[in-house]
A protein has these predicted regions:
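N-terminal Rossmann-like NAD(P) cofactor-binding subdomain of oxidoreductases
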Residues: 1-206, 246-250, 317-318, 322-328, ...
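Charged docking surfaces used in two-component/phosphorelay signaling
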Residues: 58, 153-363
Length: 363
């Protein structure tokens, strides 16, 4: 799915006109490659180290198992090319950079000058948080952050998106008779939906539990300390992206899966290093990069512009609900709410832009 979105973005930005691509597959070797404005050659074998080693750049959206199987073999063969990857497998390696160029372009340029060859996309939620709050991190105003996330089905995969829609349909069908009865009581509708979610017949092979009409308050593995792996990534990856591994900012929170299709949302609480007026903070956020848009902290604007429905399929990362909160009179605390497309800035776009950076370096 990330690969499909990456292809769409490369078409839209005319990237294919700048490169000579070869396409690889683990399951459809020899079949015709994708149409890229012209016919492409048959698909090559993605398990062939020899064929991969002929590439100057490999862009992988195949997942961590593939990376763990092929990457060591490819490097062991003597390949000196650039590896760009959506998977998490290599993110925390010392010889890899997590790429988010609007935020860490200086880090990327420094790595290129030092001969670093591995450039990895970050965790979707972490990347979207850093894009939205870039202005505060850039100004070194952040002492710590907590993020309460509302994560879309797309973060779990394409089949999870399909299952979410099936669950929605299943719940509707279960309550349909009560819903369409003009004299019916809403409690009858509620009872029918609740029964559908609990009776074991709801499609749940992917999630394991109901998401439609419910939520999942745990994402990824249990680290055994009360924290999920998804929650751990915020501080680990966030500080690596910011180049602060030697002086890490505390970043933590609770990650929750909800019934949105492809946009992650986050409610943030930030402790600031110094007190600033809200209008100055909003200006910093708005000017940090061209994709952030500050939404006025007003009811209508928030409901219209600060939702997955409004943002899905766009590169915009709106930030709203920005206000001070009185947790402690001796310090300055801020709340904010941000939304972003998990498949764009959360996955495909940093990879696409890293490829363009390499092309610029080569030229």
């Amino acid at each position: 799915m990330v690969g499909s979105v990456l292809m769409q973005r490369m078409h839209a930005e005319r990237d294919f006109a700048l490169i000579e691509p070869a396409f690889f597959s683990t399951s459809r070797v020899g079949q015709m490659g994708p149409f890229i404005g012209k016919e492409s050659a048959p698909l090559k074998d993605a398990m062939s180290v020899k064929e991969l080693a002929a590439m100057d750049v490999v862009v992988s959206c195949q997942g961590g198992e593939y990376t763990n199987a092929i990457f060591p073999q490819l490097r062991a063969s003597g390949w000196k090319g650039y590896w760009i990857d959506a998977a998490s497998a290599l993110r925390m390696r010392g010889d890899a950079v997590i790429v988010l160029d609007p935020v860490n372009m200086d880090l990327i340029k420094d790595a290129l000058s030092r001969g670093v060859r591995n450039y990895i996309g970050g965790n979707c939620t972490v990347s979207l948080m850093l894009m939205g709050m870039h202005g505060l991190f850039k100004a070194d105003l952040v002492e710590w952050v907590t993020a309460m996330t509302y994560q879309a089905a797309s973060g779990a995969g394409a089949e999870h998106m399909r299952e979410l829609v099936r669950q929605m349909g299943f719940a509707h069908q279960a309550a349909r008779a009560a819903l369409e009865d003009p004299a019916g009581a809403i409690l009858d509708v509620d009872k029918a939906v609740t029964s559908a979610l609990r009776n074991g017949s709801l499609p749940s092979a992917q999630f394991g539990f109901p998401v439609a009409g419910s939520l999942l308050p745990w994402i990824d593995k249990d680290l055994g300390n009360g924290q999920s792996r998804e929650e751990w990534k915020a501080q680990a990856e966030g500080n690596k992206i910011l180049g602060r591994e030697d002086r890490p900012l505390p970043i933590d929170g609770v990650c929750v899966r909800i019934g949105a299709m492809r946009c992650h949302s986050q409610a943030l609480t930030v402790k600031l290093r110094r007190d600033l007026p809200v209008d100055e903070i909003e200006q910093m956020l708005a000017e940090a990069n061209e994709w952030v848009r500050v939404v006025p902290n007003e009811r209508e604007a928030s409901l219209r512009e600060l939702t997955p429905a409004a943002v899905s399929g766009t590169l915009q990362v709106p930030v709203g609900r920005v206000r001070k909160i009185a947790l402690d009179k001796s310090a300055s605390y801020l709340t904010a709410f941000t939304v972003g497309d998990q498949l764009l800035w959360g996955a495909a776009e940093p990879l696409r832009r890293m490829l363009r950076i390499l092309l610029d370096v080569a030229s």
